[in-house]
Amino acid sequence: LPSPRWIEAIGLAAIQRGVISEEYDSMLKSHELLGFMSPSLANEILAFTFDEEKPTYRAVLQAVAEARHVRLVFLERQARTQRNATILATLTRPNLDVAAGTLLRIWLVKKQSAMLVDFLNALGIANENGVVEDLPAAVEDPMLKAAVDSLLAKYPPETVAVYLNAFNDMNQANWPNLKSLLESEPRLQLGAAG
């Protein structure tokens, strides 16, 4: 992962310009992750952003307002629960993948950094608070399985699933064995928490 400041700067600028990230056929995109995860986890991510990352929340809200062809003030005046439902429903659209990706990256890097560090350390990948400059082109199956198992023993399975899907897509790592594990491991299925 790039540095959090870089993510914020690029992500917010991309949202404001409406740039869509490059798509990869094999993995779930950010807008799909938000659509498939449980409503409780999606709301937790949005609540964290609202409470801890106001500039990101506002940029995402602006992107949603533009996508829905309404003024920002219209969404700001809604009750928070209604506004959050609107945000989450809108972020599942493909044209808002950058906004969804920024929301997920901020939540992962700022709130789930311990999980990121645990995963990378288990794989023997040098990192700084879960941020990596260069990823290996591949990792061995036994090492990957052990790293994923250690995450599942320590963190909520759906949170692990979101991280691993985002990791494989956003970092362009695209490790085939991680993709296979995400598809076959029942504990890594999204939406299980309700």
Each language-model region and where it sits:
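Hydrophobic membrane-targeting and insertion signals
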Residues: 2-20, 27-36, 181-182
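Alpha-helical oligomerization segments
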Residues: 161-192
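Compositionally biased, intrinsically disordered low-complexity segments
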Residues: 13, 18, 22, 48, ...
